[in-house]
Amino acid sequence: MNRRDLIKSSLFTAGAVAAGSTQAQPATHIWPHPPNELNGARMPNILWICADMQRFDTIEGLNNDYIHTPNLRKLMAESVTLTHTYVQNPVCSPSRASFLTGRYPHTTGLRALGQRIRPDERLVTQILCEAGYACGLAGKLHLSPTFGGRLEDRIDDGYSVFDWSHDLSNQWPGHNMWRLWLNDQGVKWPNPPEGLRGRAWGVPIDPKYTQTAWCSDKAIQFIHGQRNFGPWLMSVNIYQPHAPYWPTGTYLDRYNAADIPSPNYREGELKNKPIYQQVDHAGSSGGHGISFVHTSDQDHRRMKAAYYAMIEQVDTEVGRMLQALEESGQAENTIVIFMSDHGDMLGDHGIFLKGPYFYEGAIRVPMIIRWPGHYKAGLRSDALVEMVDLAPTLLEAAGIPIPLGMQGRSLTPLLTGQTSQHRDSIYCEYFDSLALYDPPPMAVCVRNDQFKIVYYQKLRAGEFYDLEKDPNETYNLWDAGSARAARDEMMHTMMARMIDTVDPIPERKCLW
C-alpha cells in the first residue's frame, strides 16, 4: 500500500466534527510523514476554498454595502485581494479544469459540460502530491460527466481524501457523501412549493445541514488531523451560491429585498447584442430557466437577496475554517485562497445564471490570497489576472518546478508587492460549453484596461465595449464607426492571445 492509500484509510478515523464547532479529534496517522521541506525551505500548507458561481462584487468592503461578509472582510485585511481576476470559461467544468491545471480550457480538452478531462492532464494537486503533500477534497470536483447518477470518473488527481458531493439533488444516491450524511442524520432536504421553483426561497432547515457547512466540517476535521504533520492541501468546494437561489431561512431573513438595488439592465439594450442573450432574457439556460421577462422587479431583488444570503453562509463557514487553522497552530504556514469558479449574471443585462456571454458578472470572480510573512497583507490590486495563474503560483510557493505544460504566469511578484502589473489583457473562451443554443456558440473574449471585445464565430459578429466610458457594458459598439479603429486593434490583440494559448507540449526534442 502506498502513502496515499494509507493516508486515505487512516486520516478520517476520528469521529465527525460536532456541528457548529471547529473542534475535531486528530486522526491517527500510521505512515511516517515526509519532512515539511523541499531544498531546505519549509513547504506551506494550502487551504483552497472555492465557492460556486460567486461573482466579483459580492464581498463586504468591495463596493457592496448590502451584503454581510465580515469574515471575508477580515481575511482581506490580512491578504492580497486581486479585484480583477477572470476565469477562462464562464461554465463550471471547463473553468475548473483550467485553474486546476494552469492551462486553457481548449488545451485541457475539457471545453464543455459533459466532457471528460484527458487522463494525461496533470492537476496541480497531483504535482503537489508527488512532492509529498497530503491532498484532501470536500465537495465538488466536476472534471468529468456526472449526469444520470454516476460518480464522475477520476484521473490521477492526487487526492487521498475524497469526500465528494455535487449539488442539492439526490441523483447520486450512493455517491453524494453529503446526502448520505443527511440520511444518517435522519434529515430530509425539503422541496420548495411549486410556485417558488425558479425563484428565491428560504429553506426551512438548520444551516448546519447544508452542503456548505458539511464541506466546512470536513475541512476542519482534515485541518486538525494534520496539525502535527505536513505539508497538506485541502480543497473545499462549496456549492453555494450556485442556483437555485435557496438559502436557509435563517440567512434569507437577514435581507430585505426592497433595500437591494435592481439588476443593471437598460430596456432595449439587447437589440444589437448576440441572439443568445435575447434567448436567455426570455429564459436562462437556452430558454429553459429563470425568465427575466416573466418575473417582476420584486422577484429580481428577492433573488439577489437570496444569493447574498447564501454568500453570507459561505462567509460564516470561511470564518470557522480560519478559526480551525488558528486553533491548530497552522495559520502562519498556510496559504489560504478564497475564490470562485465563475460568476452569475444575477439579472444584469436582463439575464440570470450563466451562458455564452462575457460580462464582468459572468467571468470576473473574487480572489483573496493570504500567506503570513510572505504575501503583502492588506494589498488590494486591480492588475489583470487569469485563473490559470494560480497553479504555477502555488508550485512556486512550494518550491516545486513549474512544468512545461502550464500556461499561467506565477502571481508571486504581484502578491509580494514587487510589481503592480501582471498582464496586458485577459483571455476567456466559450466553445458550446452548455449545448443549449442554436447555432452552437463558439466565442472568444479578450479585455484589457480599457476595452472588451467578444467574437462569435458562427454569427460572424460580436460585442465591443469601452469600459472607461461604459463600465456597465450597456452599449455594444461593434458596428459603431467611431469605435472601428479601436475594435480592429483589439481584434489583433485577440488573435495574438489565441496564438499564445497553443499547447506548449509535447516538448520538441530535436530539429526533426
What residues fall within each predicted segment?
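A short, polar/proline- and glycine-enriched secondary-structure boundary/capping micro-motif
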Residues: 464-466
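Formylglycine-dependent sulfatase
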Residues: 2-456, 461-462, 471-492, 496-499, ...
